[in-house]
Amino acid sequence: MKVRMYNVGFGDCFCLRDRKKSLLVDFGTNNSRIEGRPRREIFDLIISDLSTINSKNLLLTHFHMDHLSGLLYMMKKKDISVDFGKIYLPDVFSKKEMSRTLVLLLLADLLKESGLPSRQVSLFALVDALLENRQNVELLSRGKIFENKYQTLWPDVDIIQKETDEVYDQLSRDERFNEVMDVLLDFAEKLRKIIWSMTEEGKIQVEEAQEKISLAYVYDREFRRIKAIPAFKELLNDLNENKVNLRQFKHKISIVFQNAKDGELNLLFTGDAQPEHMRMITENYDGKLPLYEHYWCIKVPHHGTQGHYF
Protein backbone atom coordinates (compact mmCIF):
# COMPACT_ATOMS: atom_id res chain seq x y z
CA MET A 1 0.00 0.00 0.00
CA LYS A 2 1.25 3.46 -0.93
CA VAL A 3 -0.35 6.80 -0.05
CA ARG A 4 0.41 9.75 -2.30
CA MET A 5 -0.51 13.24 -1.12
CA TYR A 6 -0.69 15.81 -3.90
CA ASN A 7 0.17 19.39 -3.02
CA VAL A 8 -3.05 21.30 -3.65
CA GLY A 9 -2.54 24.02 -1.04
CA PHE A 10 -5.63 24.42 1.14
CA GLY A 11 -7.38 21.36 -0.18
CA ASP A 12 -7.33 17.57 -0.24
CA CYS A 13 -6.13 15.10 -2.85
CA PHE A 14 -4.79 11.67 -1.91
CA CYS A 15 -4.23 8.53 -3.91
CA LEU A 16 -4.26 5.15 -2.16
CA ARG A 17 -2.42 2.70 -4.38
CA ASP A 18 -1.88 -1.03 -4.29
CA ARG A 19 -1.11 -3.63 -6.93
CA LYS A 20 -4.71 -4.20 -7.97
CA LYS A 21 -6.52 -0.85 -7.85
CA SER A 22 -6.12 2.78 -6.80
CA LEU A 23 -8.53 5.03 -4.92
CA LEU A 24 -8.38 8.81 -5.28
CA VAL A 25 -9.74 10.46 -2.13
CA ASP A 26 -10.99 13.97 -2.94
CA PHE A 27 -9.56 16.28 -5.59
CA GLY A 28 -9.84 19.99 -4.91
CA THR A 29 -8.42 23.22 -3.51
CA ASN A 30 -9.56 26.66 -2.42
CA ASN A 31 -6.34 28.26 -3.67
CA SER A 32 -6.21 30.11 -6.98
CA ARG A 33 -2.42 29.68 -7.00
CA ILE A 34 -0.26 26.97 -5.43
CA GLU A 35 3.42 27.71 -4.86
CA GLY A 36 3.19 30.54 -7.38
CA ARG A 37 1.55 28.46 -10.09
CA PRO A 38 -2.07 28.73 -11.31
CA ARG A 39 -4.10 25.91 -9.86
CA ARG A 40 -5.11 24.69 -13.32
CA GLU A 41 -1.44 23.78 -13.91
CA ILE A 42 -1.42 21.75 -10.69
CA PHE A 43 -4.69 20.09 -11.67
CA ASP A 44 -3.24 19.22 -15.09
CA LEU A 45 -0.18 17.63 -13.45
CA ILE A 46 -2.38 15.52 -11.18
CA ILE A 47 -4.64 14.50 -14.07
CA SER A 48 -1.56 13.53 -16.09
CA ASP A 49 -0.33 11.38 -13.21
CA LEU A 50 -3.74 9.76 -12.79
CA SER A 51 -3.84 8.92 -16.50
CA THR A 52 -1.00 6.43 -15.92
CA ILE A 53 -3.23 4.39 -13.56
CA ASN A 54 -5.37 1.88 -15.41
CA SER A 55 -7.83 0.91 -12.68
CA LYS A 56 -8.96 3.69 -10.36
CA ASN A 57 -12.00 4.86 -8.45
CA LEU A 58 -12.77 8.18 -6.76
CA LEU A 59 -14.19 8.95 -3.33
CA LEU A 60 -15.58 12.42 -2.56
CA THR A 61 -15.87 12.84 1.20
CA HIS A 62 -18.27 15.79 0.92
CA PHE A 63 -19.29 18.70 -1.29
CA HIS A 64 -16.92 21.57 -0.57
CA MET A 65 -14.84 23.06 -3.37
CA ASP A 66 -11.55 22.41 -1.55
CA HIS A 67 -12.39 18.72 -1.98
CA LEU A 68 -13.98 18.61 -5.46
CA SER A 69 -12.93 21.61 -7.59
CA GLY A 70 -10.26 19.50 -9.33
CA LEU A 71 -12.83 16.91 -10.32
CA LEU A 72 -15.10 19.62 -11.77
CA TYR A 73 -12.14 21.01 -13.72
CA MET A 74 -11.35 17.52 -14.98
CA MET A 75 -14.92 16.90 -16.12
CA LYS A 76 -15.11 20.21 -17.99
CA LYS A 77 -12.00 19.52 -20.06
CA LYS A 78 -13.23 18.05 -23.32
CA ASP A 79 -9.82 16.58 -24.21
CA ILE A 80 -9.72 14.41 -21.07
CA SER A 81 -11.46 11.10 -20.56
CA VAL A 82 -12.97 10.75 -17.08
CA ASP A 83 -12.31 7.07 -16.62
CA PHE A 84 -13.06 6.37 -12.97
CA GLY A 85 -14.63 2.96 -12.63
CA LYS A 86 -16.80 4.22 -9.81
CA ILE A 87 -17.38 7.36 -7.77
CA TYR A 88 -18.20 7.02 -4.08
CA LEU A 89 -20.36 9.70 -2.44
CA PRO A 90 -21.82 10.15 1.06
CA ASP A 91 -25.31 8.70 1.20
CA VAL A 92 -27.65 11.66 1.16
CA PHE A 93 -29.41 10.42 -1.97
CA SER A 94 -30.94 6.98 -1.35
CA LYS A 95 -34.21 8.06 0.33
CA LYS A 96 -36.76 10.72 -0.54
CA GLU A 97 -36.59 12.33 2.92
CA MET A 98 -32.90 13.05 2.28
CA SER A 99 -34.01 15.85 -0.06
CA ARG A 100 -34.36 17.95 3.08
CA THR A 101 -30.62 17.59 3.69
CA LEU A 102 -29.95 18.59 0.08
CA VAL A 103 -32.01 21.77 0.58
CA LEU A 104 -29.75 22.73 3.49
CA LEU A 105 -26.65 21.98 1.41
CA LEU A 106 -27.89 24.20 -1.43
CA LEU A 107 -28.66 27.04 0.96
CA ALA A 108 -25.29 26.66 2.69
CA ASP A 109 -23.37 27.65 -0.44
CA LEU A 110 -25.50 30.73 -1.05
CA LEU A 111 -25.11 32.34 2.35
CA LYS A 112 -22.63 35.20 2.74
CA GLU A 113 -20.64 33.25 5.32
CA SER A 114 -20.28 30.22 3.08
CA GLY A 115 -16.55 30.81 2.66
CA LEU A 116 -16.69 30.13 -1.07
CA PRO A 117 -14.95 32.93 -3.01
CA SER A 118 -16.39 31.71 -6.31
CA ARG A 119 -19.97 31.72 -4.94
CA GLN A 120 -20.38 28.46 -6.84
CA VAL A 121 -22.97 26.07 -5.48
CA SER A 122 -20.82 22.99 -5.11
CA LEU A 123 -23.59 20.39 -4.79
CA PHE A 124 -25.35 21.67 -7.91
CA ALA A 125 -22.03 21.98 -9.76
CA LEU A 126 -21.28 18.33 -9.00
CA VAL A 127 -24.71 17.12 -10.15
CA ASP A 128 -24.41 19.27 -13.27
CA ALA A 129 -20.99 17.77 -14.07
CA LEU A 130 -22.24 14.23 -13.50
CA LEU A 131 -25.14 14.85 -15.88
CA GLU A 132 -22.62 15.75 -18.58
CA ASN A 133 -20.28 12.86 -17.66
CA ARG A 134 -22.44 10.09 -16.25
CA GLN A 135 -20.60 7.82 -13.85
CA ASN A 136 -21.24 4.70 -11.82
CA VAL A 137 -21.99 5.94 -8.31
CA GLU A 138 -21.99 4.07 -5.01
CA LEU A 139 -23.34 5.67 -1.85
CA LEU A 140 -21.55 5.13 1.46
CA SER A 141 -22.91 5.15 5.01
CA ARG A 142 -21.82 3.71 8.35
CA GLY A 143 -21.01 0.01 8.18
CA LYS A 144 -20.72 -0.28 4.40
CA ILE A 145 -17.68 -2.09 2.98
CA PHE A 146 -16.28 -0.80 -0.31
CA GLU A 147 -13.38 -1.72 -2.58
CA ASN A 148 -13.48 -5.04 -0.67
CA LYS A 149 -11.09 -3.56 1.89
CA TYR A 150 -12.40 -0.29 3.37
CA GLN A 151 -15.07 0.21 6.02
CA THR A 152 -17.28 3.29 6.22
CA LEU A 153 -17.50 4.84 9.71
CA TRP A 154 -19.57 7.90 8.76
CA PRO A 155 -22.11 9.23 7.78
CA ASP A 156 -24.81 7.61 9.89
CA VAL A 157 -27.95 8.23 7.83
CA ASP A 158 -30.30 8.10 10.83
CA ILE A 159 -28.32 10.68 12.80
CA ILE A 160 -27.93 12.96 9.78
CA GLN A 161 -31.67 12.78 9.15
CA LYS A 162 -32.43 13.68 12.77
CA GLU A 163 -30.04 16.65 12.69
CA THR A 164 -31.46 17.72 9.33
CA ASP A 165 -35.06 17.64 10.57
CA GLU A 166 -34.22 19.81 13.57
CA VAL A 167 -32.84 22.60 11.37
CA TYR A 168 -35.27 22.17 8.48
CA ASP A 169 -38.32 22.27 10.75
CA GLN A 170 -36.99 25.42 12.37
CA LEU A 171 -36.66 27.12 8.97
CA SER A 172 -40.13 25.97 7.96
CA ARG A 173 -41.82 27.57 10.97
CA ASP A 174 -41.70 30.99 9.30
CA GLU A 175 -44.81 31.08 7.11
CA ARG A 176 -43.22 33.69 4.85
CA PHE A 177 -40.93 31.03 3.43
CA ASN A 178 -43.24 28.01 3.25
CA GLU A 179 -43.83 28.30 -0.48
CA VAL A 180 -40.21 28.84 -1.48
CA MET A 181 -39.08 26.02 0.84
CA ASP A 182 -41.50 23.71 -0.98
CA VAL A 183 -40.07 24.84 -4.32
CA LEU A 184 -36.54 24.17 -3.05
CA LEU A 185 -37.55 20.77 -1.73
CA ASP A 186 -39.03 19.80 -5.09
CA PHE A 187 -35.83 20.88 -6.86
CA ALA A 188 -33.65 19.03 -4.34
CA GLU A 189 -35.68 15.88 -4.93
CA LYS A 190 -34.89 16.14 -8.66
CA LEU A 191 -31.17 16.40 -7.86
CA ARG A 192 -31.45 13.43 -5.50
CA LYS A 193 -33.05 11.31 -8.22
CA ILE A 194 -30.28 12.21 -10.67
CA ILE A 195 -27.57 10.85 -8.38
CA TRP A 196 -29.72 7.91 -7.30
CA SER A 197 -30.23 6.97 -10.97
CA MET A 198 -26.45 6.50 -11.29
CA THR A 199 -26.32 3.81 -8.58
CA GLU A 200 -26.97 0.14 -9.28
CA GLU A 201 -30.18 0.15 -7.22
CA GLY A 202 -31.35 3.46 -8.65
CA LYS A 203 -30.85 2.43 -12.28
CA ILE A 204 -33.26 -0.46 -11.80
CA GLN A 205 -35.90 1.73 -10.14
CA VAL A 206 -35.65 4.44 -12.80
CA GLU A 207 -35.99 1.88 -15.59
CA GLU A 208 -39.00 0.25 -13.92
CA ALA A 209 -40.70 3.61 -13.37
CA GLN A 210 -39.66 4.78 -16.86
CA GLU A 211 -38.56 8.10 -15.38
CA LYS A 212 -36.66 10.50 -17.59
CA ILE A 213 -33.67 12.50 -16.41
CA SER A 214 -33.49 15.85 -18.23
CA LEU A 215 -30.37 17.43 -19.69
CA ALA A 216 -28.14 19.60 -17.50
CA TYR A 217 -29.27 22.93 -18.94
CA VAL A 218 -32.87 22.24 -17.88
CA TYR A 219 -31.89 22.03 -14.21
CA ASP A 220 -29.55 25.00 -14.51
CA ARG A 221 -32.40 27.10 -15.91
CA GLU A 222 -34.74 25.97 -13.13
CA PHE A 223 -32.16 26.74 -10.43
CA ARG A 224 -31.64 30.23 -11.85
CA ARG A 225 -35.39 30.78 -11.77
CA ILE A 226 -35.59 29.71 -8.12
CA LYS A 227 -32.74 32.03 -7.11
CA ALA A 228 -34.60 34.93 -8.77
CA ILE A 229 -37.76 34.42 -6.67
CA PRO A 230 -38.15 37.42 -4.28
CA ALA A 231 -39.06 35.14 -1.37
CA PHE A 232 -35.87 33.14 -1.95
CA LYS A 233 -33.74 36.26 -1.72
CA GLU A 234 -35.65 37.24 1.41
CA LEU A 235 -34.97 33.80 2.89
CA LEU A 236 -31.22 34.17 2.31
CA ASN A 237 -31.24 37.65 3.86
CA ASP A 238 -33.08 36.31 6.88
CA LEU A 239 -30.62 33.44 7.32
CA ASN A 240 -27.68 35.83 7.02
CA GLU A 241 -29.13 38.35 9.47
CA ASN A 242 -29.84 35.62 12.02
CA LYS A 243 -26.41 34.08 11.42
CA VAL A 244 -27.81 30.62 10.77
CA ASN A 245 -24.82 28.34 10.23
CA LEU A 246 -25.67 25.85 7.50
CA ARG A 247 -22.08 25.36 6.32
CA GLN A 248 -21.70 22.70 9.00
CA PHE A 249 -24.06 20.43 7.05
CA LYS A 250 -21.38 19.94 4.40
CA HIS A 251 -19.18 18.64 7.21
CA LYS A 252 -21.89 16.62 8.93
CA ILE A 253 -22.22 14.31 5.92
CA SER A 254 -18.46 13.87 5.39
CA ILE A 255 -17.29 10.31 4.79
CA VAL A 256 -14.95 8.80 7.38
CA PHE A 257 -13.41 5.41 6.63
CA GLN A 258 -10.74 2.95 7.69
CA ASN A 259 -9.46 -0.36 6.36
CA ALA A 260 -11.89 -3.19 7.03
CA LYS A 261 -9.34 -5.52 8.65
CA ASP A 262 -6.91 -4.64 11.43
CA GLY A 263 -3.31 -4.89 10.22
CA GLU A 264 0.10 -3.25 10.11
CA LEU A 265 -0.90 -0.59 7.58
CA ASN A 266 -4.12 0.71 9.11
CA LEU A 267 -5.58 3.83 7.48
CA LEU A 268 -8.05 6.36 8.87
CA PHE A 269 -9.38 9.06 6.54
CA THR A 270 -11.69 11.65 8.07
CA GLY A 271 -12.57 14.18 5.34
CA ASP A 272 -13.89 17.24 7.17
CA ALA A 273 -15.88 15.41 9.84
CA GLN A 274 -17.30 17.47 12.68
CA PRO A 275 -15.59 17.18 16.11
CA GLU A 276 -18.77 15.88 17.76
CA HIS A 277 -19.10 13.15 15.15
CA MET A 278 -15.42 12.21 15.45
CA ARG A 279 -15.89 11.84 19.20
CA MET A 280 -18.87 9.56 18.56
CA ILE A 281 -16.80 7.47 16.15
CA THR A 282 -13.89 7.29 18.60
CA GLU A 283 -16.23 6.14 21.37
CA ASN A 284 -17.86 3.56 19.03
CA TYR A 285 -21.25 5.04 19.92
CA ASP A 286 -23.32 2.16 18.53
CA GLY A 287 -20.96 -0.65 19.57
CA LYS A 288 -20.58 -1.87 15.99
CA LEU A 289 -17.38 -0.38 14.53
CA PRO A 290 -14.47 0.12 16.95
CA LEU A 291 -11.37 2.00 15.87
CA TYR A 292 -8.06 0.15 15.85
CA GLU A 293 -5.36 0.55 18.50
CA HIS A 294 -2.84 1.92 16.02
CA TYR A 295 -2.80 3.49 12.56
CA TRP A 296 -0.06 3.71 9.99
CA CYS A 297 -1.68 6.76 8.35
CA ILE A 298 -4.32 9.19 9.65
CA LYS A 299 -5.70 11.99 7.53
CA VAL A 300 -6.96 14.53 10.08
CA PRO A 301 -10.15 16.60 9.54
CA HIS A 302 -10.18 20.14 8.18
CA HIS A 303 -6.54 20.13 7.03
CA GLY A 304 -5.41 20.05 10.67
CA THR A 305 -6.86 23.45 11.64
CA GLN A 306 -6.87 23.87 15.41
CA GLY A 307 -10.52 24.86 15.67
CA HIS A 308 -11.53 21.35 14.65
CA TYR A 309 -9.46 19.32 17.11
CA PHE A 310 -11.50 16.77 19.01
What are these regions (language model features)?
Residues 10, 31-33, 63-69, 94-97, ...:
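Active-site environment of divalent metal-dependent phosphoester hydrolases
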Residues 36-47, 71-74, 106-130, 279-286:
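Well-ordered, non-membrane alpha-helical segments in soluble/globular domains
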Residues 36-89, 287-305:
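Active-site metal-binding motif and surrounding structural segment of the metallo-beta-lactamase
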